Structures are given as C-alpha cells and as structure tokens.
Amino acid sequence: MSDIPSGALEADESRAVSLLSRVILPRPGEPLDVRKLYIEESTTNSRRAHAPTRTSLEIGPESEVSFATYFNAFPASYWRRWSTLDTVVLRVELTGTARVDVYRSKATGARITVGGAPVAGEGDGPAAVEFEIDLTPFEDGGWIWFDITTNTAVRVHSAGWYAPVPAPGRANVAVGIPTFNRPADCVNALAALTSDPLVDEVISAVIVSDQGTSKAKDHPGFADAAARLGDRLSIHNQPNLGGSGGYSRVMYEALKNTDCEQILFMDDDIRIEPDSILRALAMNRFAKSPILVGGQMLNLQEPSHLHVMGEVVDRANFMWTAAPNAEYDHDFAKFKLSDAEEPRTKLLHRRVDVDFNGWWMCMIPRQIAEELGQPLPLFIKWDDAEYGLRAGEHGYGTVTLPGAAIWHMAWSDKDDAIDWQAYFHLRNRLVVAALHWDGPVSGLIASHLKATIKHLLCLEYSTVAIQNKAMEDFLAGPENLFSILESAMPDVRKLRSQYPDAVVLPGATSLPPASDMRRKKIAIPVSKPAIAVNLARGVVHQLRSHDPETHVRPQINVATQDARWFSLCRVDGVTVTTADGRGVVYRQRDRAKMFALLRASLRQQARLARKFDRMRKVYRDALPMLTSTQKWESVLLTETPEKVGR
C-alpha cells in the first residue's frame, strides 16, 4: 500500500469482516480523567460529547473529538508482530456531517497522516465510511487512530477495528475466577460477564473456585448474577490453596468438563472493561501460532493510571521488572497518547515484548494448557510468571495487549513486600529460578542480601524471619510444596506474629506521644558518599543496645513513604503507617534479635550458594509431578462441586 494519504474505501462492499475491537465510550458520569481513556475533546468544543450507550457518541456541531486514546486507538504493532493479518479496517457509522481523519504513529511517537474523508449521513440511516490500513510499517511500534471533526451535530452509531477476513477457530471461552472471602467482588465480576451481549455470546462456561468461609453464593446479588449465566456457572468449594490452587482448579475443570478453546483467568477483585475479553479473544484467534494473551492493569484507585505496558524477569538477579522501553505508572489523563513531545508517552508507541502476564486477566489457549499442564503449587506469587516462562520454553509467546485491561488495586496500597506475602515472594522466586534460569545464583543472592540489610535497618524483623523460612522451605525440595500448600500461609503468619512490626495498631494515638519532637526529616542520600555516611552511622547505631523506654513510647511517628532505611536506621522505636493508611505498626530495635536474624539469613544464603545447582536438577526433575493433573486432583477434589442452573 502507498504511504501517500488517501481517502476512504469505495462504498460498494464492506471490508470490515471480523470485529477485532469496538470503539467504546465512557460510562455515564465518569470523571474527566477516566473519560480521557476513551476520547480526547478539543478545548474549543462548545459542549462535551455525550455517550447514550457504551458504543455510540453524540458530538456537537463545530467540534473535534480524537480517539487517540488508550481504549480506542488500535495497537497496530502488536497485531503486526503476533497476528496473521496484513491490514486492518476501520469502520465508522454516523449521522450528521463530519470529516473522519485517520492517523498512525511511528515507534518514535511521531504522527503520520494516513487519510481522511468527509461523511454525511441523513434521513434513512447512518452513513458508513471505511479505511483499510496496511500493518507493514509497524514492525517496532505504532498505533492507529482517527479523529472526527463535525460540521453539524453528529451521532456516531458505532465504530470499530476489523479484520478483512473471517476469524479462524472457535470463540468458546471458559472464564475462571478464584475467590477468597470477597463475595461482593466475585458477584460483581460475574455480573460484568453478562453485561455486554457480545461478551456473553462467547462465554461457554464460568468456573468459580471459592476458597473462603464467606461464600459468593450467600451474597444477596448472587442469585441474579447466577441466573444470567444459567448452567454455564459452576461453583467449586475447596480449602484456601491460594491463587495457584484457585487457578489450577479452573484449568482442571475447564479441560476436563468443557470443550472450551480458550481459558480466561480473571481475579475476583477487579473491574473489567468487557470489550477487553473480545479483544484478547480476537488476538487469540488471529495469532500466527498459539500464544498467551494478557490484559494490562489500570489502577483501581487512580483509574487513568496504567501499571505498566509489560514485564519481564531480569536474568541478572531473577526478579520481575518493567520490560525494556516500559515504565511504571503512566497517567493517561496527564500524558495523552498523541503527545509525541513527552518522553514518557513516546515509550508507549514502542512495542513491548514480555516474559509473562499477570493472572488478573490472561487468556490461555486450550492447546497450551493441555501441553504445559497445571500451574505450580505456589499458593501466591510467581505462579503467573512461571507459567509464562514455561510457555516460552515450549515455544509459545506471551503478549500483553494494550487496550485490553482491567482495573485492580495498585501494589503501592499494599505491604506485600514486607508482610506475610514476603515469604511467598522469596520462596517462589527461588523455585521458579531453579526451574527456568541457568544464570549464576550470585546475582539473586546479592539482591537478597541487600534487601535483608535494608529490612534489618528498617526494623522489619518479621520480614527477615519469614524470608529465612522461605529459603529453608525451598531447600527442603519440591515434594514439600504440595504438603505445605494449605498450611504454609497460617504457619508464616504465626511465625511473623512473634515480632512487634507485624502487629497492626489502630493508629499512633494507641501509644504515648512520640518523644523526639525535634527530629527533622532526613534528606534522601543520593551520592555514594552520602549513602556511605548514612549507612555507617546506621550500622554503628545498630551495634548499640537499645533504650528500653523507646519500646514503651516511640521516638517518632513515620508515614509509609518516609519509612526508608536512612530514616529508620538510627531509631530504637518508631510507628510506621501501613500502606493502606488504616493503621500503624510499632517497630522496635533489638540488637540481639537483629544479629540472630542476620546470622540465620547468612547461613541460609550460604546454603543456597552451595546447593543451588543441585536444586536446579531436583526441581526440574520434579516439574512433571508438580504440574500433573493426577497430583493436583489429590488436593483439589475434596468437596462436591455445585452446578448452578436457571
């Protein structure tokens, strides 16, 4: 196709054959920052555009609306890389008089004009205009979008991105939702699946693994949500086996008791944009070869913020991180997609390749699930990353698809790096590293040693204690994972409760007022000399005995964001606010405990260094057992499933 801007396709026969993604509009009453995920309106417009439905838009006369937005621009480079398509078709149906202009971006973020045409729809019905855009120029990055400039009042009846050929395979999705004591969230997720008729059509089964004591079926809204799903919904009660146990049950039931072609993993505590399911499904069906298709994560509390475009595992220290050319926490309300001058926005136009996708939303083809087997028995953390790495070793890629997304609570509102979950972070990181990493373990151990020192300087003794247990349990071998799948979490919480930094108090007023009223906030040390000086002073302080009075009355009260090692390394008693702001913990320095924990950690790290190569072989030999259906049946099939009918 020519690079010269051109007009619309001839109106004879539509080239829009198979829907890839609809243009979707904000819900009624959405705030401005959320609206910017869907449309960008010119400041010269006389009034805001109004969306009567999720797929139609009313625009005033003499107005300009751009669809260069997160949900409505087309991520062309991902379709160029992963799909069989050579072109994509934009179809817009509207009444009124307007002009539709189509643009694309390069991997640098620079805007290129593709073409445009006037459109006039009157009387009998809307006029349709189509543009077919070549995907060849999108090897390294780029999006496609369109703008509408109106002369008269215009109603966009529908718009969407289409393939010019029929979709291969079948649309037959089994949706799986593990839940634990979140009945309201689970019911909302179930209701969302039937809120959109096109989404409802492609869902053949909904599998809920309910692992809590507060059951979803007992929620007042459950009956209505279940009635809409009919006999497609099944509830499976089981002990609390964590996310990995919940998703393993989903995969087990989907493969054994449905004829689904796609298995969609979804968290219970999310808000989903329903069209995301159709977008992931379209990528699944048009893929050159079977792939895992993941949705991205938006921040539930700051809805215009994208968590990250994609993630990889850093092979230097075997820790997940943002993929190359990706950054965390992009605010689309502040930095719009078409802002080519903003460095953060430019990165959004580069295609990001990933190692895995979070299981907040991830579509797995049946073929891959049958070949790879079940998730690992990890309870929580790293199970999704491991499955992506395992898939990659079998030749199956993972795509984190822009524009397919859910809203989920941000990690910044959680203390999971220091609370009981820190055990699973480390133990499972070691397990997955043993299975899928051939690099020197020195990088991983060095990063953990650095983290241990920081935890001790921050008086996070409970974190170090459970991480020592994590190393011990990893070295106990793979056979141990199933035997402690249900018991590890309560055991870890019990161990952690022995330390004051694990006890959450209602607030700082639960204790006497802080004694040091003159202490100033310490500036963040940036230069190496400043870091060295602060560290040396902190270490010297750690060698001294603590003042017993500081374990009765804290010296200072510190906010979460200020609880850094250089702020806490020279105090003996301090309250620190929890990440969610709902309480405080009273951290207390204890030289004897600190040295005992440090010695235990160094011993375990030395054991890791000596034994890690042998553990690689042990875990890899055990992988067929860890992922086998038969082994999982022994822990999953403990209660009778409930089939929910109309």
Curated annotation (Swiss-Prot):
Cofactor or coenzyme needed: Mn(2+); Mg(2+)
An annotated GO BP: cell wall organization
Catalysed reactions, semicolon-separated: beta-D-galactofuranosyl-(1->5)-beta-D-galactofuranosyl-(1->4)-alpha-L-rhamnosyl-(1->3)-N-acetyl-alpha-D-glucosaminyl-diphospho-trans,octa-cis-decaprenol + 28 UDP-alpha-D-galactofuranose = [beta-D-galactofuranosyl-(1->5)-beta-D-galactofuranosyl-(1->6)]14-beta-D-galactofuranosyl-(1->5)-beta-D-galactofuranosyl-(1->4)-alpha-L-rhamnopyranosyl-(1->3)-N-acetyl-alpha-D-glucosaminyl-diphospho-trans,octa-cis-decaprenol + 28 UDP + 28 H(+)
E.C. no: 2.4.1.288
Record-level GO cellular component terms: plasma membrane
Binding locations of UDP-alpha-D-galactofuranose: 182, 211, 240, 267
Active-site residues (renumbered): 384 (proton acceptor)
Keyword Magnesium belongs to the record: yes
Pathway connected to this protein: Cell wall biogenesis; cell wall polysaccharide biosynthesis
A Pfam family hit: Glyco_tranf_2_3
Spans through the membrane: none
Main subcellular localisation: membrane
Binding site for Mn(2+): 267, 269, 408
Function according to Swiss-Prot or TrEMBL: Involved in the galactan polymerization of the arabinogalactan (AG) region of the mycolylarabinogalactan-peptidoglycan (mAGP) complex, an essential component of the mycobacteria cell wall. Thus, successively transfers approximately 28 galactofuranosyl (Galf) residues from UDP-galactofuranose (UDP-Galf) onto the galactofuranosyl-galactofuranosyl-rhamnosyl-GlcNAc-diphospho-decaprenol (Galf-Galf-Rha-GlcNAc-PP-C50) acceptor produced by GlfT1, with alternating 1->5 and 1->6 links, forming a galactan domain with approximately 30 galactofuranosyl residues.
Family affiliation: Belongs to the glycosyltransferase 2 family.
PANTHER family named among the record's database cross-references: GALACTOFURANOSYLTRANSFERASE GLFT2, RHAMNOSYLTRANSFERASE WBBL
Protein name per Swiss-Prot or TrEMBL: Galactofuranosyltransferase GlfT2
Source species: Mycolicibacterium smegmatis (strain ATCC 700084 / mc(2)155)
